[in-house]
Each structure stands twice: as C-alpha cells, then as structure tokens.
Design a protein with these regions (language model features):
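Conserved PLP phosphate-binding loop immediately N-terminal to the Schiff-base lysine helix
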Residues: 1-18
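Short, conserved loop/helix-junction motifs that constitute active-site signature segments
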Residues: 20-23
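PLP-dependent aminotransferase class I/II
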Residues: 26-79
Length: 79
C-alpha cells in the first residue's frame, strides 16, 4: 500500500519489490489518488498487479458494489 508515498521526500523509488523476478506471484501495489491530489473522501485509487492477480480481483469486484463517486473519478483523471 503506497497511499502516502507522495509525502516521502527521500529520493528514489519507495522500494525495489518489482525487481524480484517472482513479484507477479505475490505482489499487489495499491495507490491512492485521493491522498496525492487532495480528493479527501472520494476514495479514488489504482492497483498494479500481474494479469492473473487482476483477474482474481475482478471476480471479487463483480460481487460487491464499490464505486468512487463521479466527482472523485473526474478529479483523478484531471489531476
């Protein structure tokens, strides 16, 4: 979860997890546009994962009603 990575002033990437050859088997990266672009309360984010992991996540999302409001989605696209 890299929700607060934009508040870290150290130079360079926050980690080297994606350099591990087996990252696709276990790693899911989460990011929050809500924090980075000050979209407080709009719950807009992104996920980076291997295609197989994303397919599993999509199965879950098909069973729950989760959606950021349109204002937050548009602000994230604009930001």
């Amino acid at each position: 979860d890299e929700t607060y990575r934009d508040f870290d002033s150290r130079p360079g990437p926050p980690h080297d997890l994606f350099t591990d050859p087996g990252w696709a088997d276990t790693l899911i990266q989460l990011y929050s546009f809500s924090k980075a672009y000050r979209l407080t309360g709009h719950r807009v984010g992104a996920m980076v994962a291997a295609p197989a992991r994303l397919a599993e996540v999509e199965k879950f999302l098909d069973t729950v009603a989760i959606c950021a409001g349109q204002i937050g989605q548009r602000a994230a696209l604009w930001g």
